[in-house]
Amino acid sequence: MYRVDMTDTQNRTFPSILSQQASYNANGEFLVTDKRRLSFAEVEQQTNQLAAGLRNLGVAAGDRVALMLSNDIEIVLLALAINKLGAAWTPINAEYKGDWLLDNVLRCRCTLLVVDEALQSRIVAIQDQLGDEKIVLIGDPQSSDLTHAISYQSLLACDEINIDLSTIDYGDTCSILWTSGTTGKSKGVMQSYNCWIRAIIYGASKQYDSVAGDVIYNTLPMYHSAAWITGIYRALIEGIPCVIEQKFSVTTFWDRISEFKATQSFILGAMGVFLLNAPEKDNDADNTLRISGVVPLSPEQRVRFEERFQVKITRGGLGQSECLLVCNQFGTFKEERDDIPLHALGYAVEDSEVCLMDDNGKPVDDEQIGEICIRPLQPYVVLNGYFDNPEATAEAFFGEWYRTGDLGRKDPDNGALFFVDRKKDAIRFAGRNISTMEVESVAIRHPEVKEVAAFGIASAEVESEHELKLNVVRTEGSQLSHETLAEFINDNAPHYFVPRYMEFVDSLPMTPTSKVQKFKLREAGINAATWDLKASSYQVKR
Protein backbone atom coordinates (compact mmCIF):
# COMPACT_ATOMS: atom_id res chain seq x y z
CA MET A 1 0.00 0.00 0.00
CA TYR A 2 1.30 3.44 -0.97
CA ARG A 3 -0.86 6.53 -0.52
CA VAL A 4 -0.03 9.34 -2.96
CA ASP A 5 0.24 12.82 -1.39
CA MET A 6 -2.78 14.80 -2.55
CA THR A 7 -1.90 18.08 -0.81
CA ASP A 8 0.18 19.06 -3.86
CA THR A 9 -2.19 19.95 -6.71
CA GLN A 10 0.49 18.85 -9.20
CA ASN A 11 -0.26 15.30 -8.06
CA ARG A 12 -4.00 15.66 -8.61
CA THR A 13 -4.21 14.03 -12.03
CA PHE A 14 -4.69 10.33 -12.62
CA PRO A 15 -1.69 9.97 -14.98
CA SER A 16 0.52 11.53 -12.28
CA ILE A 17 -0.90 9.30 -9.53
CA LEU A 18 -0.43 6.17 -11.64
CA SER A 19 3.15 7.17 -12.43
CA GLN A 20 3.94 7.51 -8.72
CA GLN A 21 2.29 4.20 -7.85
CA ALA A 22 4.27 2.50 -10.64
CA SER A 23 7.48 3.93 -9.14
CA TYR A 24 6.89 3.41 -5.41
CA ASN A 25 4.39 0.52 -5.42
CA ALA A 26 5.33 -1.21 -8.67
CA ASN A 27 4.40 -4.76 -7.70
CA GLY A 28 1.35 -3.84 -5.70
CA GLU A 29 -1.86 -5.27 -7.13
CA PHE A 30 -4.22 -2.71 -8.63
CA LEU A 31 -6.84 -4.29 -10.93
CA VAL A 32 -8.22 -7.76 -10.23
CA THR A 33 -10.73 -10.00 -12.01
CA ASP A 34 -11.31 -13.75 -12.19
CA LYS A 35 -8.80 -14.10 -15.00
CA ARG A 36 -6.26 -11.33 -14.43
CA ARG A 37 -4.33 -9.49 -11.77
CA LEU A 38 -2.46 -6.37 -12.89
CA SER A 39 0.08 -4.49 -10.78
CA PHE A 40 0.49 -0.73 -10.86
CA ALA A 41 3.62 -1.13 -12.99
CA GLU A 42 1.77 -3.33 -15.49
CA VAL A 43 -1.09 -0.85 -15.72
CA GLU A 44 1.42 1.96 -16.31
CA GLN A 45 3.05 0.01 -19.13
CA GLN A 46 -0.19 -1.04 -20.81
CA THR A 47 -1.73 2.43 -20.62
CA ASN A 48 1.40 3.91 -22.21
CA GLN A 49 1.05 1.39 -25.05
CA LEU A 50 -2.66 2.16 -25.41
CA ALA A 51 -1.95 5.89 -25.41
CA ALA A 52 0.45 5.36 -28.32
CA GLY A 53 -2.17 3.37 -30.23
CA LEU A 54 -4.88 5.94 -29.55
CA ARG A 55 -2.61 8.76 -30.69
CA ASN A 56 -1.96 6.87 -33.93
CA LEU A 57 -5.73 6.83 -34.47
CA GLY A 58 -5.89 10.61 -34.13
CA VAL A 59 -6.85 11.06 -30.47
CA ALA A 60 -5.38 14.33 -29.17
CA ALA A 61 -5.73 16.74 -26.27
CA GLY A 62 -9.26 18.07 -25.94
CA ASP A 63 -10.85 15.14 -27.78
CA ARG A 64 -13.46 12.76 -26.43
CA VAL A 65 -13.40 8.97 -26.61
CA ALA A 66 -16.67 7.13 -25.95
CA LEU A 67 -16.52 3.81 -24.10
CA MET A 68 -19.40 1.34 -24.32
CA LEU A 69 -17.97 -1.51 -22.31
CA SER A 70 -18.94 -4.18 -19.84
CA ASN A 71 -17.33 -4.21 -16.40
CA ASP A 72 -13.74 -5.32 -16.96
CA ILE A 73 -10.15 -4.12 -16.74
CA GLU A 74 -10.20 -2.62 -20.25
CA ILE A 75 -12.42 0.32 -19.34
CA VAL A 76 -9.93 1.38 -16.65
CA LEU A 77 -6.91 0.98 -18.93
CA LEU A 78 -8.60 3.00 -21.65
CA ALA A 79 -9.76 5.77 -19.32
CA LEU A 80 -6.21 6.22 -17.98
CA ALA A 81 -4.64 6.04 -21.46
CA ILE A 82 -7.09 8.59 -22.85
CA ASN A 83 -6.22 10.97 -20.02
CA LYS A 84 -2.50 10.60 -20.76
CA LEU A 85 -3.18 12.21 -24.14
CA GLY A 86 -5.05 15.12 -22.54
CA ALA A 87 -8.36 13.78 -23.85
CA ALA A 88 -11.55 12.92 -21.94
CA TRP A 89 -13.31 9.58 -21.70
CA THR A 90 -17.08 9.41 -21.72
CA PRO A 91 -18.82 6.18 -20.69
CA ILE A 92 -21.99 5.11 -22.45
CA ASN A 93 -24.52 3.21 -20.37
CA ALA A 94 -24.27 -0.46 -21.29
CA GLU A 95 -28.08 -0.67 -21.10
CA TYR A 96 -28.59 1.87 -23.91
CA LYS A 97 -29.80 0.77 -27.34
CA GLY A 98 -31.63 2.11 -30.38
CA ASP A 99 -32.42 5.82 -30.60
CA TRP A 100 -31.34 6.48 -27.01
CA LEU A 101 -27.90 5.03 -27.73
CA LEU A 102 -27.61 6.82 -31.08
CA ASP A 103 -28.47 10.18 -29.53
CA ASN A 104 -25.88 9.70 -26.78
CA VAL A 105 -23.09 8.72 -29.18
CA LEU A 106 -23.81 11.58 -31.58
CA ARG A 107 -23.95 14.19 -28.84
CA CYS A 108 -20.55 13.05 -27.51
CA ARG A 109 -18.97 14.21 -30.80
CA CYS A 110 -16.26 11.66 -30.11
CA THR A 111 -13.14 10.98 -32.14
CA LEU A 112 -13.31 7.31 -31.27
CA LEU A 113 -15.85 4.81 -29.97
CA VAL A 114 -14.68 1.66 -28.17
CA VAL A 115 -17.10 -1.26 -27.77
CA ASP A 116 -16.70 -4.85 -26.61
CA GLU A 117 -17.99 -8.07 -28.17
CA ALA A 118 -20.87 -8.44 -25.73
CA LEU A 119 -22.34 -5.05 -26.70
CA GLN A 120 -21.30 -4.69 -30.34
CA SER A 121 -24.70 -5.73 -31.76
CA ARG A 122 -26.18 -2.51 -30.40
CA ILE A 123 -23.61 -0.45 -32.29
CA VAL A 124 -24.11 -2.57 -35.43
CA ALA A 125 -27.81 -1.63 -35.34
CA ILE A 126 -27.04 2.10 -35.52
CA GLN A 127 -23.70 2.22 -37.35
CA ASP A 128 -25.23 3.53 -40.61
CA GLN A 129 -26.43 6.62 -38.73
CA LEU A 130 -23.13 7.40 -37.01
CA GLY A 131 -20.69 10.09 -38.08
CA ASP A 132 -16.97 9.92 -38.77
CA GLU A 133 -15.92 8.43 -35.45
CA LYS A 134 -13.61 5.44 -35.68
CA ILE A 135 -14.71 2.25 -33.91
CA VAL A 136 -12.39 0.04 -31.87
CA LEU A 137 -13.62 -3.45 -31.00
CA ILE A 138 -12.43 -5.44 -28.01
CA GLY A 139 -12.74 -8.75 -29.82
CA ASP A 140 -12.17 -10.08 -33.33
CA PRO A 141 -13.08 -7.53 -36.04
CA GLN A 142 -12.93 -10.26 -38.70
CA SER A 143 -15.96 -12.03 -37.25
CA SER A 144 -17.86 -8.83 -36.49
CA ASP A 145 -20.63 -7.09 -38.45
CA LEU A 146 -19.09 -3.75 -37.54
CA THR A 147 -17.79 -1.95 -40.62
CA HIS A 148 -14.06 -1.14 -40.58
CA ALA A 149 -13.68 -1.94 -36.87
CA ILE A 150 -10.16 -1.64 -35.47
CA SER A 151 -8.73 -4.31 -33.17
CA TYR A 152 -8.12 -3.30 -29.56
CA GLN A 153 -5.16 -5.69 -29.49
CA SER A 154 -3.49 -3.67 -32.25
CA LEU A 155 -3.41 -0.69 -29.89
CA LEU A 156 -1.68 -2.73 -27.19
CA ALA A 157 0.94 -3.81 -29.74
CA CYS A 158 2.28 -0.26 -30.01
CA ASP A 159 5.53 0.78 -28.34
CA GLU A 160 5.18 2.77 -25.13
CA ILE A 161 5.28 6.54 -25.31
CA ASN A 162 6.66 8.89 -22.70
CA ILE A 163 4.03 11.21 -21.28
CA ASP A 164 4.88 14.78 -20.30
CA LEU A 165 2.84 14.98 -17.10
CA SER A 166 3.44 18.73 -16.83
CA THR A 167 1.01 19.30 -19.72
CA ILE A 168 -1.88 17.80 -17.74
CA ASP A 169 -3.55 20.13 -15.21
CA TYR A 170 -5.75 19.18 -12.28
CA GLY A 171 -8.49 21.45 -13.64
CA ASP A 172 -8.60 19.81 -17.08
CA THR A 173 -11.75 17.96 -18.07
CA CYS A 174 -10.84 14.28 -17.82
CA SER A 175 -14.30 12.72 -18.15
CA ILE A 176 -17.81 13.48 -19.32
CA LEU A 177 -20.56 11.55 -17.55
CA TRP A 178 -24.12 11.84 -18.76
CA THR A 179 -27.03 12.56 -16.43
CA SER A 180 -29.80 9.98 -16.34
CA GLY A 181 -32.37 12.00 -18.28
CA THR A 182 -35.17 12.04 -15.70
CA THR A 183 -36.10 15.63 -16.68
CA GLY A 184 -35.62 15.30 -20.44
CA LYS A 185 -32.50 14.89 -22.54
CA SER A 186 -29.44 13.85 -20.58
CA LYS A 187 -26.64 16.39 -20.15
CA GLY A 188 -22.92 15.74 -20.44
CA VAL A 189 -21.21 16.73 -17.18
CA MET A 190 -17.61 17.83 -17.77
CA GLN A 191 -15.59 16.72 -14.74
CA SER A 192 -12.07 17.79 -13.84
CA TYR A 193 -9.47 15.61 -12.17
CA ASN A 194 -9.88 17.66 -9.01
CA CYS A 195 -13.65 17.21 -9.06
CA TRP A 196 -13.05 13.46 -8.70
CA ILE A 197 -10.07 13.58 -6.37
CA ARG A 198 -11.52 15.99 -3.80
CA ALA A 199 -14.54 13.69 -3.47
CA ILE A 200 -12.19 10.86 -2.58
CA ILE A 201 -9.82 12.62 -0.18
CA TYR A 202 -12.58 14.51 1.68
CA GLY A 203 -15.18 11.76 1.41
CA ALA A 204 -14.53 8.13 0.47
CA SER A 205 -11.01 7.90 1.92
CA LYS A 206 -12.20 9.31 5.25
CA GLN A 207 -15.10 6.89 5.32
CA TYR A 208 -13.15 3.73 4.53
CA ASP A 209 -9.89 4.59 6.35
CA SER A 210 -7.91 1.97 4.41
CA VAL A 211 -5.01 0.00 5.86
CA ALA A 212 -2.51 -2.42 4.34
CA GLY A 213 -4.26 -5.60 3.26
CA ASP A 214 -7.56 -3.93 2.35
CA VAL A 215 -9.19 -5.06 -0.90
CA ILE A 216 -12.06 -3.23 -2.63
CA TYR A 217 -14.85 -5.24 -4.26
CA ASN A 218 -16.78 -3.35 -6.96
CA THR A 219 -20.01 -4.67 -8.49
CA LEU A 220 -21.33 -1.30 -9.68
CA PRO A 221 -21.52 -0.59 -13.43
CA MET A 222 -18.50 1.36 -14.62
CA TYR A 223 -20.62 4.06 -16.25
CA HIS A 224 -21.66 5.07 -12.71
CA SER A 225 -19.47 7.56 -10.83
CA ALA A 226 -19.69 5.62 -7.55
CA ALA A 227 -17.74 2.74 -9.12
CA TRP A 228 -14.80 5.10 -9.61
CA ILE A 229 -15.00 7.17 -6.42
CA THR A 230 -15.36 4.26 -4.01
CA GLY A 231 -13.54 1.76 -6.21
CA ILE A 232 -11.09 2.38 -9.07
CA TYR A 233 -9.85 5.90 -8.40
CA ARG A 234 -9.72 5.42 -4.64
CA ALA A 235 -7.68 2.23 -5.12
CA LEU A 236 -5.33 4.19 -7.40
CA ILE A 237 -4.79 6.94 -4.82
CA GLU A 238 -4.48 4.60 -1.82
CA GLY A 239 -2.39 1.95 -3.55
CA ILE A 240 -4.68 -1.00 -2.81
CA PRO A 241 -6.33 -3.61 -5.09
CA CYS A 242 -9.79 -3.21 -6.59
CA VAL A 243 -11.74 -6.25 -7.76
CA ILE A 244 -13.91 -5.55 -10.82
CA GLU A 245 -16.97 -7.81 -10.85
CA GLN A 246 -19.03 -8.19 -14.02
CA LYS A 247 -22.30 -7.57 -12.19
CA PHE A 248 -23.99 -7.79 -8.81
CA SER A 249 -25.48 -11.13 -7.76
CA VAL A 250 -27.40 -11.77 -4.54
CA THR A 251 -26.64 -15.49 -4.60
CA THR A 252 -22.88 -15.17 -5.08
CA PHE A 253 -22.10 -11.83 -3.38
CA TRP A 254 -20.78 -13.19 -0.08
CA ASP A 255 -18.98 -16.12 -1.70
CA ARG A 256 -17.17 -13.72 -4.02
CA ILE A 257 -16.30 -11.44 -1.11
CA SER A 258 -14.62 -14.37 0.62
CA GLU A 259 -12.99 -15.64 -2.58
CA PHE A 260 -11.20 -12.32 -3.14
CA LYS A 261 -10.75 -11.68 0.61
CA ALA A 262 -12.41 -8.32 0.02
CA THR A 263 -12.71 -5.96 2.99
CA GLN A 264 -14.48 -2.97 1.40
CA SER A 265 -17.39 -2.49 -0.98
CA PHE A 266 -20.15 -0.11 -2.03
CA ILE A 267 -23.62 -1.16 -3.15
CA LEU A 268 -26.45 1.00 -4.45
CA GLY A 269 -30.18 0.94 -4.93
CA ALA A 270 -32.00 -2.28 -4.12
CA MET A 271 -28.79 -4.34 -3.75
CA GLY A 272 -28.67 -3.94 0.02
CA VAL A 273 -32.36 -4.77 0.41
CA PHE A 274 -31.93 -7.87 -1.77
CA LEU A 275 -29.11 -9.07 0.48
CA LEU A 276 -31.24 -8.45 3.57
CA ASN A 277 -34.21 -10.28 2.09
CA ALA A 278 -32.16 -13.34 1.16
CA PRO A 279 -32.75 -16.37 3.44
CA GLU A 280 -30.68 -16.15 6.60
CA LYS A 281 -27.79 -18.57 7.11
CA ASP A 282 -25.90 -19.53 10.25
CA ASN A 283 -22.65 -18.22 8.72
CA ASP A 284 -23.94 -14.85 7.47
CA ALA A 285 -21.38 -13.04 9.64
CA ASP A 286 -18.54 -15.28 8.48
CA ASN A 287 -17.16 -13.00 5.78
CA THR A 288 -14.11 -10.79 5.22
CA LEU A 289 -16.02 -7.58 4.51
CA ARG A 290 -15.13 -4.90 7.07
CA ILE A 291 -16.94 -1.81 5.77
CA SER A 292 -19.32 -0.96 2.94
CA GLY A 293 -21.49 1.78 1.62
CA VAL A 294 -25.10 0.54 1.38
CA VAL A 295 -27.37 3.22 -0.09
CA PRO A 296 -30.22 3.70 0.55
CA LEU A 297 -31.27 1.83 3.68
CA SER A 298 -33.75 2.87 6.34
CA PRO A 299 -32.34 3.23 9.88
CA GLU A 300 -34.01 -0.08 10.80
CA GLN A 301 -32.56 -1.86 7.75
CA ARG A 302 -29.14 -0.41 8.49
CA VAL A 303 -29.13 -1.91 12.00
CA ARG A 304 -30.27 -5.29 10.68
CA PHE A 305 -27.59 -5.29 7.97
CA GLU A 306 -24.76 -4.42 10.35
CA GLU A 307 -25.83 -6.97 12.96
CA ARG A 308 -26.55 -9.81 10.56
CA PHE A 309 -23.42 -9.51 8.41
CA GLN A 310 -21.12 -7.84 10.97
CA VAL A 311 -20.22 -5.13 8.46
CA LYS A 312 -19.88 -1.45 9.28
CA ILE A 313 -21.91 0.78 6.95
CA THR A 314 -20.46 4.13 5.91
CA ARG A 315 -22.25 7.29 6.99
CA GLY A 316 -24.40 9.65 4.94
CA GLY A 317 -23.53 12.37 2.47
CA LEU A 318 -24.56 14.00 -0.79
CA GLY A 319 -22.94 13.87 -4.19
CA GLN A 320 -23.95 14.01 -7.84
CA SER A 321 -22.23 13.97 -11.22
CA GLU A 322 -21.89 17.77 -11.21
CA CYS A 323 -20.33 17.89 -7.75
CA LEU A 324 -19.18 14.46 -6.69
CA LEU A 325 -19.08 15.51 -3.02
CA VAL A 326 -21.38 18.26 -1.77
CA CYS A 327 -21.26 17.38 1.92
CA ASN A 328 -20.89 14.44 4.29
CA GLN A 329 -21.11 13.61 7.98
CA PHE A 330 -17.40 14.12 8.51
CA GLY A 331 -17.44 17.68 7.15
CA THR A 332 -14.21 19.25 8.38
CA PHE A 333 -14.11 16.96 11.43
CA LYS A 334 -11.50 14.22 11.75
CA GLU A 335 -13.78 11.70 13.43
CA GLU A 336 -17.41 10.63 13.22
CA ARG A 337 -19.88 12.51 15.43
CA ASP A 338 -22.40 10.53 17.44
CA ASP A 339 -24.78 13.51 17.74
CA ILE A 340 -25.64 13.45 14.02
CA PRO A 341 -28.47 11.14 12.89
CA LEU A 342 -27.31 8.44 10.49
CA HIS A 343 -29.60 9.67 7.69
CA ALA A 344 -28.24 13.23 7.79
CA LEU A 345 -26.26 14.59 4.82
CA GLY A 346 -23.89 16.35 7.19
CA TYR A 347 -21.72 19.39 6.51
CA ALA A 348 -19.64 21.09 3.85
CA VAL A 349 -16.03 19.93 3.57
CA GLU A 350 -12.78 21.91 3.62
CA ASP A 351 -12.84 23.36 0.11
CA SER A 352 -16.42 24.65 -0.08
CA GLU A 353 -19.42 26.26 1.60
CA VAL A 354 -23.02 25.04 1.53
CA CYS A 355 -26.13 27.20 1.81
CA LEU A 356 -29.89 26.67 1.49
CA MET A 357 -31.38 29.16 -0.99
CA ASP A 358 -34.77 30.21 -2.31
CA ASP A 359 -35.75 30.51 -5.98
CA ASN A 360 -34.06 33.90 -6.21
CA GLY A 361 -30.70 32.78 -4.88
CA LYS A 362 -31.22 34.24 -1.41
CA PRO A 363 -30.47 32.29 1.80
CA VAL A 364 -33.61 30.96 3.50
CA ASP A 365 -34.31 31.45 7.19
CA ASP A 366 -33.32 28.81 9.72
CA GLU A 367 -35.57 25.74 9.73
CA GLN A 368 -36.94 26.59 6.26
CA ILE A 369 -36.55 24.27 3.29
CA GLY A 370 -34.29 25.54 0.53
CA GLU A 371 -32.26 24.39 -2.45
CA ILE A 372 -28.86 23.01 -1.43
CA CYS A 373 -26.21 25.16 -3.10
CA ILE A 374 -22.42 24.87 -2.91
CA ARG A 375 -19.79 27.59 -3.37
CA PRO A 376 -16.20 26.47 -4.03
CA LEU A 377 -13.47 27.99 -1.89
CA GLN A 378 -10.83 26.45 -4.17
CA PRO A 379 -10.73 25.86 -7.95
CA TYR A 380 -12.37 22.93 -9.74
CA VAL A 381 -14.72 21.76 -7.00
CA VAL A 382 -17.79 21.49 -9.24
CA LEU A 383 -18.35 20.69 -12.91
CA ASN A 384 -16.49 22.51 -15.67
CA GLY A 385 -19.86 22.93 -17.37
CA TYR A 386 -22.31 20.90 -19.42
CA PHE A 387 -20.82 19.75 -22.72
CA ASP A 388 -22.15 21.79 -25.67
CA ASN A 389 -24.87 23.24 -23.45
CA PRO A 390 -24.02 26.76 -22.20
CA GLU A 391 -27.66 27.50 -21.42
CA ALA A 392 -27.92 24.60 -18.97
CA THR A 393 -24.56 25.58 -17.48
CA ALA A 394 -25.78 29.13 -16.82
CA GLU A 395 -29.01 27.87 -15.27
CA ALA A 396 -27.05 25.65 -12.87
CA PHE A 397 -25.54 28.60 -10.98
CA PHE A 398 -26.56 31.49 -8.75
CA GLY A 399 -23.40 33.51 -9.36
CA GLU A 400 -20.64 31.58 -7.58
CA TRP A 401 -23.10 29.09 -6.11
CA TYR A 402 -23.78 25.81 -7.90
CA ARG A 403 -27.41 24.72 -7.57
CA THR A 404 -27.71 21.01 -6.82
CA GLY A 405 -31.42 20.80 -7.59
CA ASP A 406 -31.91 19.10 -4.21
CA LEU A 407 -34.03 20.53 -1.42
CA GLY A 408 -32.75 20.36 2.13
CA ARG A 409 -33.30 21.59 5.64
CA LYS A 410 -30.88 22.34 8.44
CA ASP A 411 -31.00 20.97 11.98
CA PRO A 412 -31.35 24.02 14.27
CA ASP A 413 -29.29 22.40 17.02
CA ASN A 414 -26.21 20.97 15.29
CA GLY A 415 -26.42 22.60 11.85
CA ALA A 416 -26.42 19.31 9.94
CA LEU A 417 -28.15 19.21 6.56
CA PHE A 418 -30.96 16.78 5.74
CA PHE A 419 -32.27 15.81 2.31
CA VAL A 420 -35.94 16.61 1.59
CA ASP A 421 -36.50 15.90 -2.13
CA ARG A 422 -35.37 16.70 -5.64
CA LYS A 423 -36.54 20.26 -6.26
CA LYS A 424 -38.24 19.31 -9.52
CA ASP A 425 -40.19 16.60 -7.67
CA ALA A 426 -41.20 18.46 -4.50
CA ILE A 427 -44.62 20.08 -4.50
CA ARG A 428 -46.27 22.85 -2.52
CA PHE A 429 -49.82 22.27 -1.35
CA ALA A 430 -51.93 24.12 1.23
CA GLY A 431 -48.87 26.15 2.20
CA ARG A 432 -46.77 23.05 2.85
CA ASN A 433 -43.71 21.75 1.02
CA ILE A 434 -44.35 18.04 0.43
CA SER A 435 -41.57 15.60 -0.37
CA THR A 436 -42.74 13.20 -3.07
CA MET A 437 -39.98 10.85 -1.95
CA GLU A 438 -41.52 10.64 1.53
CA VAL A 439 -44.99 10.04 0.08
CA GLU A 440 -43.61 7.23 -2.09
CA SER A 441 -41.84 5.69 0.90
CA VAL A 442 -45.20 5.33 2.66
CA ALA A 443 -47.20 4.03 -0.31
CA ILE A 444 -44.60 1.41 -1.28
CA ARG A 445 -44.98 -0.21 2.15
CA HIS A 446 -48.42 -1.51 1.16
CA PRO A 447 -47.94 -5.20 0.29
CA GLU A 448 -49.91 -4.86 -2.97
CA VAL A 449 -47.90 -1.89 -4.30
CA LYS A 450 -45.07 -2.93 -6.60
CA GLU A 451 -43.96 0.52 -7.83
CA VAL A 452 -45.13 4.05 -7.19
CA ALA A 453 -44.37 7.55 -8.41
CA ALA A 454 -45.62 10.69 -6.67
CA PHE A 455 -45.69 14.01 -8.51
CA GLY A 456 -47.53 17.30 -8.71
CA ILE A 457 -50.43 18.38 -10.93
CA ALA A 458 -51.02 22.13 -11.24
CA SER A 459 -53.83 23.23 -8.93
CA ALA A 460 -56.86 24.80 -10.59
CA GLU A 461 -57.60 26.69 -7.38
CA VAL A 462 -54.24 28.16 -6.33
CA GLU A 463 -51.88 29.15 -9.15
CA SER A 464 -48.63 28.66 -7.20
CA GLU A 465 -49.56 25.26 -5.77
CA HIS A 466 -49.91 21.66 -6.94
CA GLU A 467 -52.19 18.76 -6.19
CA LEU A 468 -50.53 15.44 -5.34
CA LYS A 469 -50.95 12.52 -7.75
CA LEU A 470 -49.77 8.92 -7.41
CA ASN A 471 -49.24 6.57 -10.32
CA VAL A 472 -49.20 3.05 -8.90
CA VAL A 473 -48.17 -0.30 -10.31
CA ARG A 474 -49.92 -3.03 -8.32
CA THR A 475 -48.53 -6.49 -7.67
CA GLU A 476 -49.66 -9.28 -9.98
CA GLY A 477 -53.25 -10.32 -9.31
CA SER A 478 -53.87 -7.46 -6.88
CA GLN A 479 -57.39 -6.08 -6.45
CA LEU A 480 -56.19 -3.11 -4.39
CA SER A 481 -58.64 -0.20 -4.62
CA HIS A 482 -57.87 3.50 -4.64
CA GLU A 483 -59.78 4.00 -1.40
CA THR A 484 -57.91 1.20 0.37
CA LEU A 485 -54.54 2.65 -0.59
CA ALA A 486 -55.68 6.15 0.39
CA GLU A 487 -56.71 4.82 3.80
CA PHE A 488 -53.37 3.02 4.22
CA ILE A 489 -51.50 6.26 3.53
CA ASN A 490 -53.83 8.18 5.83
CA ASP A 491 -53.18 5.70 8.66
CA ASN A 492 -49.40 5.76 8.26
CA ALA A 493 -48.55 9.37 7.40
CA PRO A 494 -49.71 12.97 7.82
CA HIS A 495 -53.16 13.56 6.33
CA TYR A 496 -51.78 15.74 3.54
CA PHE A 497 -49.87 12.74 2.15
CA VAL A 498 -53.20 11.34 0.91
CA PRO A 499 -53.18 12.16 -2.82
CA ARG A 500 -55.85 14.19 -4.57
CA TYR A 501 -55.39 12.00 -7.63
CA MET A 502 -54.43 8.36 -8.09
CA GLU A 503 -54.05 6.12 -11.13
CA PHE A 504 -53.28 2.42 -11.44
CA VAL A 505 -50.93 1.78 -14.36
CA ASP A 506 -49.17 -1.22 -15.88
CA SER A 507 -45.74 0.42 -15.76
CA LEU A 508 -43.89 3.67 -15.11
CA PRO A 509 -41.80 5.43 -17.77
CA MET A 510 -38.16 4.72 -17.00
CA THR A 511 -34.75 5.84 -18.20
CA PRO A 512 -32.27 3.10 -19.16
CA THR A 513 -30.80 3.56 -15.67
CA SER A 514 -34.17 2.61 -14.12
CA LYS A 515 -35.10 6.09 -12.89
CA VAL A 516 -38.69 7.27 -13.24
CA GLN A 517 -39.20 9.97 -15.88
CA LYS A 518 -41.58 12.10 -13.86
CA PHE A 519 -41.67 14.83 -16.48
CA LYS A 520 -43.60 12.38 -18.70
CA LEU A 521 -46.06 11.71 -15.88
CA ARG A 522 -46.56 15.43 -15.32
CA GLU A 523 -47.11 15.96 -19.05
CA ALA A 524 -49.71 13.17 -19.13
CA GLY A 525 -51.58 14.76 -16.22
CA ILE A 526 -55.01 13.34 -15.42
CA ASN A 527 -57.38 11.34 -17.62
CA ALA A 528 -60.54 9.25 -17.51
CA ALA A 529 -58.74 6.51 -15.56
CA THR A 530 -57.62 8.91 -12.83
CA TRP A 531 -59.26 8.56 -9.42
CA ASP A 532 -60.18 11.88 -7.77
CA LEU A 533 -60.31 12.04 -3.98
CA LYS A 534 -62.88 14.84 -4.03
CA ALA A 535 -65.21 12.81 -6.24
CA SER A 536 -64.82 9.66 -4.12
CA SER A 537 -66.53 8.46 -0.98
CA TYR A 538 -63.32 8.45 1.07
CA GLN A 539 -63.03 11.01 3.86
CA VAL A 540 -59.52 11.97 4.95
CA LYS A 541 -58.92 11.61 8.70
CA ARG A 542 -57.03 14.56 10.14
Per-range role (PLM):
Residues S19, N56-L57, K84-S154, E280, ...:
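Structural core segment of the AMP-binding/adenylate-forming
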Residues Y96, L113, V354, I374-P379, ...:
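AMP-binding/adenylate-forming catalytic core of the ANL superfamily
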Residues I237, A262-I267, L276-D339, E353:
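Gly/Ser/Thr-rich phosphate-binding loop
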Residues D8-Q10, S19, N27-D72, V76-L80, ...:
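Conserved AMP-binding/adenylate-forming core of the ANL superfamily
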Residues I138, A493-K515, K534-R542:
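AMP-binding/adenylate-forming catalytic domain of the ANL superfamily
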Residues N11, N71, S143, C158-W178, ...:
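Conserved pre-ATP/AMP-binding loop-to-beta segment of ANL
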Residues I197-V215, Y223-T263, A278:
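Conserved AMP-binding/adenylation subdomain of ANL enzymes
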Residues S39-A41, C174-R198:
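Conserved AMP-binding A3 loop
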